[in-house]
């Protein structure tokens, strides 16, 4: 299939979120690696108000990915416009409105690309959070594909919500604090309403989900970061639904570790510490690029870790300033936030860090368990490296991911399935405190070999890890799906 020069140009527009960007870049690398006729230009929307280490890591990722067939263009960022939007729109509308302000930037750059006459743009590949850019694709007369960076289960729920009548989904929002369970497509077991995506709980947000479903139906295809062996029921529901565009399971799409030192000096120090720990002895706690906790919750986690007696590596981030929509940052003095003497007492068995090079850590043989927020990238990374998870979901589709991992697939143990916290805002008035006892119980289930539940989950994770690797090599389900996707790209020229 490979040829010597690119003949088909794709325009990729990823969301400014770190998790979305990482998987989108990896997807592009797979495509150009499979077919040299493809060339991809990324139009990068800069994340406003972000001066964190996460941003620096993003820059490093893009530099490392640069090659002849991949080009990265940073669209101009107007912080004043972003600040004005922040004052006008609530959190759940801000990002969408901010992305809309970049339509002219995208329009201008694509016009510049085609004006040379040497570039034939065949399609836009748009992140699920950037669907307003489909309007620009229409202006240039090219089709849009969407990269759905979450999973097939979440995609199925989006389409299912759209199929409900207004009375039905209003009834659904009113059930959210109850113990009701629902029969839903793509699931074997009844699903507690508390395990549904947090967007389904908000009457103001539900119309946005329905609008997304309608928009997705207008695409030429939907790429989903999953593989058939992991989500067979959800994939079947989507593929057999004649009202849904072609769905391409292309995962797991993750950024694999090639060089232990690629993350810098801090990562090197962390890896040296892990090198001195016994095999599968360390529980790793990390809650994503925007996950953070205040002092009360930190003390509960610290107490649980100390009481469990297990070795640990704990990523601790400081929440944004009150009322601010910011990325979490580093604590200046952890001693002030943690129980008195905690760091000294646990010095021999634990290490507390700030920002964490998550994939590098999960790949280390000393890591035996992962306390996670259940973001989908984190879930796929843990499965790839065969590290079992204790679930602590916070927002978006994370509660659904946790339910799927614990109850549907039996690949994880639970700490909490219905924890709710808006992790982008610091107002903690409605935050549920997870107790030290709950956390300790989850860690013990995860790490102790005599625990039958944990033992079973570890074996199932090992088996799924092997399946994830088979899916992406020649003859695997996702490998074949990517081949069909490339064929479809070629038909657009």
Spell out what each predicted region is.
Residues 1-493:
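Glycosyltransferase specificity loop/lid
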